[in-house]
């Protein structure tokens, strides 16, 4: 990749974007995945690498803001309605359920029409999912935290601040 003139020491989040743009340019995903089958295999591996860190990001919110009243759940890799793949991690808690709003969600998805997979929240847009090792998954923890936190912020707008147990203490 002699034409890739990016600085050698990019921060992790910019390395992900760099890889994303190169994959789009070169028509591949990862090292050499071109076929949908190979890309889906890499997606399943990425979900496996990401699982611990997605749970951690949600559990941090559960422990600190939801006062450990929430439940983290994960689906594993599933076939989506459009024929692609999806895997979700959710954090539900009593106040959220009472108000019938979405849980905090981290979703890895690979739409059937996409070149490669992405991450998103229930209310937050897309981020490239270019994870091929446990170290790369760990480096995504700040992104997962940002998606989960932004999702919670947006859920407060859908309801109000009273869905956050830690805010209601000593009130």
Name each model-derived stretch:
Residues 1-53:
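Charge-rich, low-complexity N-terminal segments
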């Amino acid at each position: 990749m002699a034409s890739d003139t990016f600085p050698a020491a990019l921060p992790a989040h910019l390395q992900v974007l760099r890889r994303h743009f190169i994959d789009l340019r070169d028509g591949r995903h990862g090292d050499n995945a071109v076929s949908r089958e190979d890309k889906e295999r890499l997606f399943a591996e990425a979900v496996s690498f990401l699982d611990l860190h997605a749970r951690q990001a949600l559990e941090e919110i559960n422990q600190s803001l939801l006062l450990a009243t929430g439940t983290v759940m994960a689906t594993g890799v599933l076939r989506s309605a459009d024929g692609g793949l999806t895997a979700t991690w959710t954090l539900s808690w009593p106040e959220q359920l009472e108000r019938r709003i979405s849980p905090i969600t981290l979703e890895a998805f690979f739409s059937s029409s996409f070149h490669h997979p992405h991450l998103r929240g229930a209310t937050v847009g897309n981020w490239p999912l270019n994870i091929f090792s446990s170290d790369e998954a760990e480096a995504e923890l700040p992104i997962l935290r940002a998606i989960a936190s932004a999702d919670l912020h947006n859920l407060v707008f859908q309801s109000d601040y009273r869905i956050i147990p830690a805010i209601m203490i000593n009130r």
